[in-house]
């Protein structure tokens, strides 16, 4: 198979979808790998390293899309790439379609096969290609939240972990999945007073057993969240419904309960966000303010630490890339039901129910 890896062009997206080691593995199996010039540079991989692994370098993004049977990316194609995706081409990346109608319709019109990292499942219903980036995003969300609590950044001017004789900041984590788990661990490690909320009692029991003493658990309800907000300094929103839009757990009216200078970090923003007042931001302009509350809503948080996140991502994706290249997407998905759940759009038809539901469009069975 001919595999193409374009350079990511989303704002400050520094990751790359394939390392030289991954390229070598594919070339060894008889596949042809094309890498766009400097695609791996920000992740620490030179064109020379890819060439040494047997990959070929192409000068432009158009060249890569034009020649490839399978495009492997990190983030969804942006508007400038829509016309480059062509009929019958397999695109394997994070899509998050349910929050992006223009992207969804563009990919339907392209006639491509869209296989989304975020909806591939393990037999136990965990999400193997979302987990590594959720781990990174969870940890970084606390780092970024702590930074924007500083006075020069417009925050309240408090240190997350406090100091002896001074209370630490209070952190509320909404959602006890992988992002929430990692957020709570990071905040607790920095010395904050942490509460993690979830609707699953079994999950709360598990978290209560494994978390440090400065992490408390709370059943997630509108009432309980409202009770927490007046004393909370930093909220991490990490709610996930696979493939679907995230629910709004904090409304605009609820912002009035918070003190000015508090920070909301919406890690769920690539699925539409879990705060009513959220809208996507970038690493170049990461924050905005609503009613005196700072919102951090960067949709590609791990892109800021590409040398960590590229390796974490490609460790997870490479086995699937190999399977797709070796067998073709139809046979690979027929043999691996978890991989088949990654299929969101096939040649103009939506085949993932949550995406169809988000836009009131028909959902077709996978043939």
Language model region names:
Residues 2, 8, 79-169, 298-300:
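Glycine/serine-rich phosphate-binding loop and adjoining beta1-alpha1 elements at the start
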Residues 2-110:
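An N-terminal-biased, well-structured beta-alpha scaffold segment characteristic
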Residues 6-42, 152-240, 287:
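Glycine-rich phosphate/diphosphate-binding loop of Rossmann-like nucleotide-binding domains
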Residues 23, 47, 104, 142, ...:
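Generic hydrophobic/aromatic pocket-lining and core-packing "Φ" positions
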Residues 69, 75-76, 95-96, 221, ...:
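Short glycine-/small-residue-rich Rossmann-like dinucleotide-binding loops
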Residues 76, 136, 177-178:
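Residue-level detector of alpha-helix initiation sites
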Residues 118-159, 269, 274-367:
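Adenosine-phosphate binding glycine-rich loop
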Residues 209-292:
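Rossmann-like adenosine-cofactor binding region
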